[in-house]
Each structure stands twice: as C-alpha cells, then as structure tokens.
Amino acid sequence: MRYGFTTGSCAAAASKAAAYMLLTGKRKTEITIETPKGIPYTAQLVDIVRSEKEVSCAVEKDGGDDPDITTGTLIYAKVSCVDCAMEAKQGHPQIVIDGGIGVGRVTKPGLDQPVGNAAINHVPREMIEKEVLQICSLVDYKGSLRVEISVPEGEGLAEHTFNPRLGIVGGISILGTSGIVEPMSNQAILDTIKVELNQRKAQ
C-alpha cells in the first residue's frame, strides 16, 4: 500500500517554496522537504501568486492509500516580509507562523497549542520553521518573515473531524508527527483519544 503525507508536510513544503520564491525572485514548480520520518517529500506547487512583498502557493494533500478526508485538499502557505529591509533585532531570521482561513483556532485548554492559537501542532510548526530558515540561510536573509497557512475547504472539512468536539473552531488542524500517513493506521484515532483525555484532565 502507498503511504501519503500529512497536512503538516504539505504546509511545510508550501511554506518553503513560498519563502524561496519571495527571497530569490525565482519561480518554482516543485519543492522537496525531508519529513521527520526521514522520507523525502517532493511536492508539486499550484496556484502560485507572487508580488514584491509576499508569495503564496499551494500543495495538494496526498493521503496515499489511507481513506483521509483531506486527500485532494489544497494547503496554502503565504509568506510575507514583516520588514524586508530590516534585519531582525536578534541578528538572525524570525519566523512568525499563524493560521488563516480554514485552519482551526483553539478555544479549550489541554490541546497541543494554547487557547487562541491556530491549530497548527508543534511538529508541523517546527517543520515549517526549519524549512523556511533553510531558505533564509541559502540567501543570507536575516529579517523577519510571516507564514500564514490556510485551507479554503477547511471549515467544511472540519465538520467531519473531531475538531468541533475538541473546541477547535473555524477549520481543520495542521497535523503530523512523522510527516507521513501510513495506510489504514490506527495511530490517528489513538492520538485523538489521547488528546481528548488530556483535554478533560486540563478542565
């Protein structure tokens, strides 16, 4: 059976590509990242929109042979300069990550992210930051960048997930610990049960 890639991997790939196009001025049609599992992921880029201060692009989620409702969904990343002309005060790039349309927002304690944050879990956040910093290093950019992840179909898809029950409103979560989706794995259900138990403990 064919494995797929998580929403976190898609978000990281789109973020890396958007950062590359913004900071180099060159167009990309595909990008490769390394997943936490060590398996490389080469993503095709679609719906590329470029301007001087921001670039957005999308990656189509491929769940492999896993019956995942997000398969075929476009995961977008928009990368913009906070101030392209200035270096960050710390002397190294600062990456700010947030969720846009179709990415859920946390409203209850006990989840991976604090209340008020976008439901982009810590491993995808680390993946996004790592890939974007790699591009910053490539071009010796030391300023600040804002990364916004969005999923236009996310709000509708979220109705078919555990998110409403967990207090995540407005969209899906950006998930993944290994970066890949193993076909017919029970891990996602076990992870959701664990999250719900942690949440009850926090209340």
Describe each PLM feature range.
Residues 152, 156-159, 163-203:
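Glycine-rich anion/phosphate-binding loop at the beta-strand->alpha-helix junction
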Residues 1-166:
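Generic N-terminal targeting/processing segments that precede catalytic cores or assembly contacts
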